[in-house]
Amino acid sequence: MNGIRDVVKEEQPRERLLLEGAGSLSNRELLAVLLRTGSKEESVLKLSDKILHHFDGLRMLKDATLEELVSIHGVGVAKATQLIAAFELGRRMVRLEYQNRYSIRSPEDCATYMMEEMRFLQQEHFVCLYLNTKNQVIHRQTIFIGSLNSSIVHPREVFKEAFRRAAASIICLHNHPSGDPAPSREDIEVTKRLVECGRIIGIEVLDHIIIGDHKFVSLKEKGHI
């Protein structure tokens, strides 16, 4: 028989998880637990290795589509949907930690709140956090997806949600898929335009945070706000 039961005792992921805890397992072993079984030709650990190699580790795997997963020999629709559901649960659990009126007192607070959700995105996402008078997050909105451009990021879309939510202030964020959070000329121009509009209508743009891979840049700290 194939699957975890066929692997030598010291490499049985489910048994190791029960005895030593999930934290003791490698990425390939955790993936094997989710997959449960291998195929006729290979063990579940070999299948795990193949999947991780195909996606160059967890970074790309977390955003894998159903089509990409089932294209791998040994991964059917059932296994693919199990993985996709597990990854989505993981993302939601990360968000739960910072929900319920998370307070932002510094650029670091803001980056911590959004880092894990945004740093792996493969396209630029422009997101606004809407805050109350106590600097607590009352709403989060993705304004658009795509390359940041002053002609695309219209202040109307940013501030419309602020009025709907009776927000006192806004923090803007977007990610750089390259992992380098250094601001571009367009990033700075968009920021200045939004800040000026905020001054006119009385809703302050507190900061614009650029998210990289475990790095971030605050345009306020850089003197652009």
Swiss-Prot record:
Pfam families: RadC, UPF0758_N. Gene3D superfamilies: Cytidine Deaminase, domain 2. Residues 103-225 form the MPN domain. GO terms for molecular function: metal ion binding; metallopeptidase activity. Keywords: Hydrolase, Metal-binding, Metalloprotease, Protease, Zinc. It comes from the Bacteria. PROSITE patterns: MPN (PS50249), UPF0758 (PS01302). Signal peptide: none annotated. Zn(2+) binds at H174, H176, D187. The keyword Protease applies. One of its GO terms (biological process) is proteolysis. InterPro entries: MPN (IPR037518), RadC_JAB (IPR025657), RuvA_2-like (IPR010994), UPF0758 (IPR001405), UPF0758_CS (IPR020891), UPF0758_N (IPR046778). Belongs to the UPF0758 family. This is UPF0758 protein BA_4685/GBAA_4685/BAS4351. It comes from Bacillus anthracis.
